[in-house]
């Protein structure tokens, strides 16, 4: 598994150092450097051996400055052992002057040094050594040709390795061509084919059941003399058969998801897979399916998944340990923010207190793509915020402000922790939810009210402690009460919106002033 990436002077990456986990989601705005990070890993460990032809000179040098050497170091674990040497990283450099450039790929030991033999000669990176940490890179094009068995290191190539051994036992292939195709379709081939076809059809289900009935996805062999290197996925509809790589990118993407599902079901280990924008060409339901599939494969140690994304489905605040937020600072340098090891335990405790239902709302993940965030307690509060933005003549989308329904106060704690770890500026507004005790009630009811008030006070204190008092605005006792809406009223969001339309935001009622001030603050420039 890859553990760490260091990049210097490659394209827009002047100097970054980021940890890599079993599942790593690289998020950030367009042009921040997400794809460059993936390309850096692919240069060192991808399908093509790195050489001078791997680089564009001077375009791949930062600011086109060829005097600053490109250096990409990828660390991995477990180490590769060769004799007495333990190799834990590879370093790729491209440097030179006066048009005399050269590229070096060097192995590094635990101390970050190139090991040397007793003779003084340095250890060199060989094919076996590089294959120890090799990665499979899937770019945004989703071309099925990337996955065919003829492509070195492809997913289907790895899936079919045991099938090749099984097929070698069939010694009459050359004698009877008519029987050859049946012989090629061993039980494992059939199982792989079935899984890919069923998953792809599931991904394409939005076309309708009638369309699915006339569609088949399966294997075809382009060259019977070299069956498994020429195996390809075919798409059959009515009497028409087409190679999979001739189809639209949406169908090809669905078939790619099917290939991953086949790997998951067979329990095979892939190594490290790098995916550029896994959401590409998939509708939302298919995106959620693919995301769960990737998470399960990473959780079960079938493979390491590293991907870039613009989708709130694939950027999940509940998996905060996987997030790497890439942005440019005021000096136009790329910086990467992530949850540090020392903060993970506290955030994990908050996550465990989070309401289960709130964990499945991908809308709150939009906070990861915002320049600033207004964190509110629930859906009604979000409706109120959007209505007040409108009355203040501020477009939150145009200002890249996320209005986030956190799903309760525990959710606010979680999102605040993630925002702080990733340096996302934020403001919080929530209800106090501390109500006067009804002295006319019986003792048991009063005791229950006191316990509820105490619990809310503790929640409020935790929010203020984690967010900072200057970022927290509290409506007393609640937004509904401030607007004259009963605690048990029905259709609260609609009532909130209708009443707020009549509010003068220039001179709001005192009870509503904290909410308006929170919105005013989040619209101002804020320090990260």
From Swiss-Prot:
Residue segments, region Disordered: 440-461
Effect after changing residue 381 to A: No change in exonuclease or nicking activity. Loss of exonuclease but not nicking
EC number: 3.1.11.3
UniProt-listed InterPro entries: ATPase_AAA_core, Bact_Antivir_Def_Nuclease, P-loop_NTPase, TOPRIM_OLD
Positions that bind ATP: 31-35
Temperature dependence, free-text field: Optimum temperature is 65 degrees Celsius for the ATPase activity.
Toprim domain as annotated region, ranges: 370-528
Outcome after substituting residue 431 to A: No change in exonuclease or nicking activity. Loss of exonuclease but not nicking. Loss of exonuclease and nicking
GO molecular function, one term: ATP hydrolysis activity
Binding site for a divalent metal cation 2: 381, 478, 480
Keyword terms of this UniProt record: ATP-binding, Exonuclease, Hydrolase, Metal-binding, Nuclease, Nucleotide-binding
Impact noted for substituting residue 140 to A: Loss of ATPase
Domain notes from UniProt: The ATPase domain dimerizes on its own via its dimerization region, the Toprim (topoisomerase/primase) domain does not. The Toprim domain has Mn(2+)-dependent nuclease activity on linear and supercoiled dsDNA. It faces away from the dimerization domain.
Name of this protein: OLD nuclease
Record organism: Thermus scotoductus (strain ATCC 700910 / SA-01)
């Amino acid at each position: 598994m890859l553990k760490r990436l260091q990049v210097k002077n490659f394209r827009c990456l002047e100097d970054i150092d980021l940890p890599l986990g079993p599942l790593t989601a690289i998020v950030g705005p367009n042009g921040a450097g997400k794809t460059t990070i993936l390309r850096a890993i692919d240069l060192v460990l991808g399908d093509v051996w790195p050489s001078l032809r791997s680089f564009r000179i001077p375009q791949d040098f930062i600011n086109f400055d060829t005097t600053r050497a490109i250096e990409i170091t990828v660390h991995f674990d477990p180490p590769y052992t060769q004799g007495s040497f333990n190799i834990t990283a590879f370093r790729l450099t491209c440097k030179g002057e006066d048009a005399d450039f050269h590229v070096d790929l060097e192995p590094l030991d635990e101390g970050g040094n190139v090991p040397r033999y007793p003779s003084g000669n340095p250890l060199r990176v060989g094919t076996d050594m590089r294959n120890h940490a090799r990665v499979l890179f899937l770019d945004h094009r989703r071309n099925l040709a990337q996955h065919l068995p003829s492509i070195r290191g492809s997913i289907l190539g790895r899936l079919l390795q045991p099938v090749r051994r099984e097929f070698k036992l069939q010694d009459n292939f050359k004698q009877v061509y008519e029987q050859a195709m049946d012989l090629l379709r061993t039980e494992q081939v059939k199982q792989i084919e079935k899984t890919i076809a069923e998953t792809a059809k599931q991904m394409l289900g939005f076309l309708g059941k009638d369309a699915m009935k006339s569609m088949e996805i399966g294997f075809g062999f382009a060259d019977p003399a070299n069956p498994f290197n020429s195996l390809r996925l075919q798409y059959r509809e009515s009497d028409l058969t087409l190679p999979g790589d001739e189809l639209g990118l949406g169908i090809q993407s669905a078939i790619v998801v099917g290939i991953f599902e086949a790997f998951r079901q067979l329990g095979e280990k892939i190594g490290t897979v790098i995916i550029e924008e896994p959401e590409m060409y998939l509708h939302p339901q298919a995106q959620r399916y693919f995301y769960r599939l990737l998470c399960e494969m990473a959780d079960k140690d079938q493979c390491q998944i590293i991907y870039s994304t613009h989708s709130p489905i694939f950027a999940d605040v509940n998996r905060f340990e996987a997030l790497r937020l890439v942005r440019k600072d005021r000096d136009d340098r790329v910086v990467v923010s992530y949850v540090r090891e020392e903060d993970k335990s506290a955030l994990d405790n908050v996550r465990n207190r989070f309401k289960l239902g709130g964990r499945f709302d991908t809308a709150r993940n939009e906070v990861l793509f915002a320049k600033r965030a207004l964190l509110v307690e629930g859906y009604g509060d979000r409706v109120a915020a959007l209505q007040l933005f409108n009355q203040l003549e501020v477009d939150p989308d145009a200002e890249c402000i996320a209005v986030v329904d956190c799903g309760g106060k525990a959710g606010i704690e979680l999102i605040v922790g993630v925002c702080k770890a990733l340096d996302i500026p934020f403001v919080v507004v929530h209800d106090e939810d501390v109500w006067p005790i009804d002295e006319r009630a019986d003792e048991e009811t009063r005791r229950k009210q006191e316990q509820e008030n105490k619990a809310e006070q503790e929640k409020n204190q935790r929010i203020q402690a984690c967010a900072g008092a200057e970022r927290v605005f509290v409506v007393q006792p609640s937004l509904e009460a401030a607007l004259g809406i009963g605690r048990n009223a029905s259709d609260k969001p609609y009532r909130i919106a209708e009443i707020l339309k009549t509010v003068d935001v220039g001179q709001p009622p005192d009870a509503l002033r904290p909410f308006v001030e929170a919105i005013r603050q989040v619209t101002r420039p804020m320090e990260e």
